[in-house]
Regions:
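Short, acidic, small-residue-rich periplasmic hinge/interaction motif at the N-terminus
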Residues: 1-26, 34
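Extracytoplasmic beta-strand/coil segments of soluble accessory domains associated
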Residues: 38-91
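Short loop/turn motifs that connect adjacent beta-strands in outer-membrane beta-barrel proteins
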Residues: 46, 142-145, 158, 174-175, ...
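N-terminal periplasmic accessory domains that precede
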Residues: 72-75, 103-108, 129-150, 165
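Short acidic/polar hinge/loop motifs at secondary-structure boundaries
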Residues: 91-119
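Transmembrane beta-barrel wall of Gram-negative outer-membrane proteins
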Residues: 144-147, 157-279, 284-286, 391-394
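C-terminal beta-signal and adjacent terminal beta-strands/loops
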Residues: 508-510, 609-612, 653, 657-659, ...
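C-terminal beta-barrel architecture of Gram-negative outer-membrane proteins
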Residues: 601-685, 701
Length: 738
């Protein structure tokens, strides 16, 4: 069995692993993987999630911190959806949109065996993007029979009427197995008029989009003789959503954005079992994500609609790899094992405006990689002694060569130490990196000429003009991070149902890509921006900016004269930001039997502290605990009780308040309660055999999100990255298995 976070079969990872199995998903009433990851305290709901609305771009995620197509992306530690790697059965998926997010909710949860999340840097194992960590969706391998199901639900305050239909079928034979599933989920929007704290916003502004999702998946495994196994994973999804943003009461029209995304994946692999317990693996993956946005302006008086913008963001990915894993020699704790491999990837991205026939970004990136990982079990069961019951060392290294920025090497060292059978201590140190997104590299560059006063200039002559450049930067380097993780797990033999783990983590994330000029109106003379402004431009420097620009805009009202250029403002993407992230995770669980059934108490919580510095001349500022950024404290605690065919669960979710950085006021915290009741008739051969009923209530007490003073009339008065406007949501589902 392969564990996420290591390529060693049956190996241990020195990093904590969060495992959420299909049974837990069912017990807690989750119906898609988006709901699952939003329940994980280590994950930030900002970035690409359906409830994120206008205004969230003020957070550290910038333009990536908004909802484009209704998907849900992992965003561990709030480092961004492009800094968490998402895998399906251990293999990469195509990026979605220009923010390089992967929509995990498009994978049908009915086919999922478990999701494993490693909230620790893992570039030494998986390469680029695994800075905040990695999430691996593992599909069910053996499924027998057919299950059909339906779910209906809605918010009691109005909106989000949901209709879901799914079918899953599978079979197992002596040498293999197959599972296939299809799901259709449609949901109505939540309008601002349906929530009293937002009903003064322009109608029909939406707080939560309406959507329609079709998703299908097939997974096959087949043994060929005794030494070869073939596996194929494939899925296809299509999601449509309607959003009504950016509308104010002062307008005579409103905007409608109709978005559609289509994702495809084909991922074959071959495992060859060699002599001496060695395994050779050959795998490939092809995936594509095409997202379109049609923005139209609707006249209120006449109802006529005119398309003002139509874009396509298309991502294509292809990869192949070959690897080997097996034992090297014997140690007192077991076999020392080695995993080695190499491969290549190619990603391509195009963002175009179909109305004008122009591209906003167009580029591709290829990379080559090689890796090695060692596991050295020095002491194990049967070979331990007083004070050392278990001792294992791990080491991994990976090298990648990218077309744009060249080579990068990421090592990782780990220790697993068990002083007694009741305690396990883990520690890891490693380097991670993230390649710049293709949008950051290849977005078109725009040059603009305007008066010095426009940029806040004082004392300039009447003819003085300022030349600015913004957009992509093909000379970007990789973002790099150093990560430390130390955890202590308590699993006493005297209480076999008790488990608890406490983790400390620290991330030093440098060379983050940002747009350095955030306030163009006060750029000139501001010491924070001095390193990005050339106050003595040469003719060569001016010509270089214009030669590299894809478009030039003259807003001075006068003919362009290079002699009038008094300064150049460089506002394109650049590697200058540094983030410091540290915190503590806690995850206890206790399972015990009662006369009335089995009770399981489990929970998870995190405390996060993070800051960011944009350039050496600028001061660091807080990220965690500020509006549109991760809250400092998040937690989820609850209980599951089961007796026979009946299961009930109740969980409390807590998110601490965040500070509005404009008026320095802190919002209230947000506490909700989720409950789920399940009843299964069991398999007894009758007409009611194989039925499963579930009633779920999210936000049982209908808590409204904490409010703040929104910066504009078209923004809702709450932080949509941390808090939800849905309110109480009731759903009922039924399924039957043959």
């Amino acid at each position: 069995m392969t564990v996420t976070g290591t390529r060693i079969r049956g190996g241990s990872t020195p990093s904590p692993v969060i495992t959420i199995g299909s049974e837990q998903i069912k017990q807690e009433g989750f119906t898609d993987l988006g709901e699952v990851i939003r329940s994980v305290p280590q994950n930030f709901s900002g970035g690409q999630n359906p409830g994120v609305v206008v205004g969230a771009t003020l957070g550290s995620g910038g333009i990536a911190n908004q909802n484009f197509a209704g998907g849900s992306a992992l965003n561990l530690r709030g480092l961004g959806p492009d800094a968490t790697l998402t895998l399906l059965n251990g293999r990469r998926l195509s990026y979605g949109g220009f923010a390089q997010a992967v929509d995990i909710s498009a994978i049908p949860v009915e086919a999922v065996d478990r999701i494993e999340i490693v909230p620790d840097g893992a570039s030494a194992i998986y390469g680029s993007d695994a800075v905040g960590g990695v999430g691996n969706v593992i599909l069910k391998r053996d499924y027998e029979g057919v299950t059909v199901g339906a779910r209906y639900g809605g918010a009691t305050e109005g909106g989000l009427g949901t209709r879901e239909y799914n079918v899953t079928a599978g079979t197992v034979w002596s040498s293999g197995g197959l599972i296939a599933t299809y799901k259709n989920t449609s949901a109505d929007p939540v309008y601002a008029r349906q929530r009293d704290y937002a009903d003064d916003m322009f109608d029909p502004t939406t707080l939560y989009p309406g959507s329609d999702l079709h998703s299908g998946l097939v997974s096959l495994h087949q043994s060929i003789g005794d030494s070869v196994e073939f596996q194929l994973d494939a899925f296809r999804t299509r999601r449509r959503q309607d959003t009504y943003p950016h509308n104010t009461r002062l307008s005579r029209s409103y905007y409608r954005i109709a978005a559609e995304s289509a994702t495809s994946l084909i991922s074959p692999s071959v495992q060859i079992y060699l002599a001496g317990d060695w395994t050779l693996s050959i795998d490939g993956s092809w995936s594509r994500d095409e997202g379109t946005q049609d923005q139209s302006q609707v006249d209120i008086a006449t109802g006529t609609r005119a398309t003002v913008f139509h874009s396509c963001s298309c991502n294509h990915a292809f990869s192949y790899a070959i690897g080997a894993e097996g034992p090297l020699f014997s140690l007192p704790g077991g076999d020392a094992r080695l995993a080695v491999g190499a491969g290549a990837r190619r990603n391509a991205f195009v963002q175009s405006n179909d109305l004008t026939g122009t591209n906003y970004a167009d580029g591709d990136e290829s990379s080559r990689f090689a890796y090695a990982e060692f596991s050295l079990p020095l002491v194990g069961q049967g070979s331990g002694f007083a004070g050392v019951r278990r001792l294992e060392l791990t080491a991994a290294v990976r090298g990648e060569d990218h077309d744009s920025f060249g080579r990068v090497t990421t090592p990782k060292l780990g220790l697993v130490y068990g002083p007694t059978d009741d305690f396990t201590l883990k520690a890891s140190w490693g380097k991670s990196f993230k390649a710049p997104t293709l949008f950051q590299l290849y977005q078109t560059q725009n040059a603009a000429l305007d008066s010095a006063s426009y940029y806040g200039g004082v004392g300039y002559g009447p003819d003085a003009a300022i030349l600015s450049v913004s957009g992509g930067n093909p000379n970007l380097d990789a973002e790099r991070a150093t990560t430390w993780t130390v955890s202590s797990a308590f699993h006493p033999e005297a209480l076999p149902g008790l488990e608890a783990e406490l983790t400390w983590f620290d991330i030093d994330y440098t060379d983050r890509v940002v747009q350095p000029i955030t306030d163009y109106a006060h750029a000139l003379g501001n010491p924070r921006y001095a390193q990005f402004i050339d106050y003595s431009p040469t003719a060569q420097g001016i010509g270089g900016v214009l030669d590299s620009a894809d478009a030039f805009y003259n807003f001075t009202g006068k003919p362009y004269d290079p002699g009038d250029v008094a300064a150049i403002v460089y506002g394109q993407y650049v590697n200058v930001a540094r983030q410091r992230i540290k915190g503590v995770d806690l995850s206890p669980s206790y399972r015990f039997d009662l006369q009335s059934g089995r009770l399981t108490i489990r929970g998870s919580a995190t405390w996060l502290d993070s800051s960011q510095q944009n350039g050496v001349a600028q001061s660091a500022y807080d990220i965690a605990g500020t509006i549109f950024n991760p809250a400092k404290v998040k937690g989820r605690l609850g209980a599951v009780w089961g007796q026979g065919r009946f299961v009930a669960s109740a969980f409390v979710n807590y998110t601490s308040g965040v500070t509005d950085t404009v008026n320095k006021r802190k919002t209230a915290s947000f506490t909700t309660v989720d409950t789920t009741l399940h009843y299964a008739t069991g398999s007894h051969g009758g007409a009611l055999s194989g039925l499963d009923f579930a009633l779920s209530v999210q936000n049982l007490f209908n808590r409204s999100p904490p409010l703040y003073a929104a910066a504009s009339l078209d923004a809702p008065p709450y932080d949509s990255t941390n808090y939800s406007a849905i309110g109480r949501f009731l759903s009922f589902s039924v399924s039957k298995h043959w």
